[in-house]
């Protein structure tokens, strides 16, 4: 390998590592806040006479299969938390392949900048999400712009050979683990730092605006880091030129290799299960063990350290 190629490879590894790390930090900041966040909006809507969360709760309570005391919202809150998390995941499911295909056509760098810019706008909305629908809108924007992870991973594949690609992907796993440690920690500690007095206005600060501000700051740092340091990894002669990008997920049935198709399906079901665990774990900790945000932080610290150990030693 030429010295210039080796330099590009090292630079790409560094930029992608920090990009994935910061992306996981801002993504996981809200994990320890989810139960408190939904309870806050329920209380707010109780004061102002209803809203999106209350309507959803009433809809859930209309089913006889839900046996819950009339004065308790806990079960319904957990369901809504899962729905909010699923909203982001479903949008990521559809849009990440689109961003990935687009990056095959125009390059990794511009797509990373587009997706990170959308992520910044989503967290900017979250700062002023006095009403729950604004929070939902910010999550929609974040889900649509959530292609940076797949594109950053593709950049690793661009600069590695088949023989050493597992080492590059292990680096991705370590960045995941580190982000999973710092993100929930920042989210848990930010809960005790309030930007301003909380009001019931539609666009206003909430007890979680400080976490949103931290997320926005890190997302902007991530955007600037890619803008300044990331060099394009996909050569022009390797870029596609066939019309509009198509979501690869809809081409799954056309995969001729049966083993590859089964592997893709298995990974799909695994990620659905894992994502469900991610977004319901905090509710389990609060409901079953009465965890505080600080104790949830400690739980995610342990999970993150385990991820780092597994990815750094076993995957590598």
Q: Residues of each region from the PLM?
A:
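C-terminal membrane-cytosol helix-exit motif in multi-pass small-molecule transporters
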Residues: 216-236
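Transmembrane alpha-helices of Major Facilitator/SLC transporters
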Residues: 296-316
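Pair of pore-lining "gating" transmembrane helices in MFS-fold secondary transporters
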Residues: 9-59, 257-277
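Cytoplasmic helix-loop-helix junction between adjacent transmembrane helices
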Residues: 137-176
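Conserved MFS/SLC helix-loop-helix module at the cytosolic interface between two early adjacent transmembrane helices
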Residues: 93-132
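Short amphipathic helix-loop junctions that connect adjacent transmembrane helices
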Residues: 33-78, 279-296
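Glycine-rich segments within core transmembrane alpha-helices of 12-TM secondary carriers
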Residues: 169-192
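Juxtamembrane intracellular "pre-TM" segments in multi-pass secondary transporters
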Residues: 2-8, 231-269, 287-288
């Amino acid at each position: 390998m030429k010295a210039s190629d080796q330099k590009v490879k090292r630079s790409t590894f560094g930029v992608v590592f920090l990009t994935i790390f910061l992306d996981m930090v801002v993504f996981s900041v809200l994990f320890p806040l989810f139960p408190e966040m939904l309870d806050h909006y329920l209380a707010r809507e109780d004061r102002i006479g209803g809203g999106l969360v209350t309507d959803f709760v009433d809809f859930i309570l209309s089913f006889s299969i839900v046996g819950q005391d009339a004065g308790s919202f806990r079960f319904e809150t957990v369901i809504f938390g899962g729905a909010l998390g699923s909203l982001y995941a479903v949008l990521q499911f559809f849009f990440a392949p689109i961003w990935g295909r687009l990056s095959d056509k125009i390059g990794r760098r511009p797509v990373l900048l587009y997706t990170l810019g959308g992520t910044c706008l989503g967290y900017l909305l979250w700062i002023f999400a006095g009403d729950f629908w604004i929070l939902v809108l910010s999550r929609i924007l974040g889900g649509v712009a959530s292609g940076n992870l797949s594109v950053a991973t593709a950049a690793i594949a661009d600069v590695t050979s088949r023989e050493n690609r597992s080492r590059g992907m292990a680096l991705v796993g370590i960045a995941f683990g580190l982000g999973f440690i710092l993100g929930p920690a920042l989210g848990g500690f930010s809960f005790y730092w309030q930007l301003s007095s909380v009001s019931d206005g539609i666009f206003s600060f909430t007890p979680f605006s400080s976490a949103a501000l931290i997320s926005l700051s890190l997302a902007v740092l991530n955007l600037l880091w890619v803008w300044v340091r990331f060099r394009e990894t996909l050569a022009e002669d390797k870029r596609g030129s066939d019309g509009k990008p198509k979501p690869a997920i809809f081409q799954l049935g056309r995969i001729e290799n049966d083993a590859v198709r089964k592997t893709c399906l298995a990974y799909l079901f695994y990620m659905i299960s894992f994502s469900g665990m991610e977004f319901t774990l905090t509710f389990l900790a609060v409901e079953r063990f009465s965890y505080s945000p600080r104790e949830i932080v400690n739980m995610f610290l342990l999970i993150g350290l385990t991820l780092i150990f597994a990815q750094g030693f076993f995957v590598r």
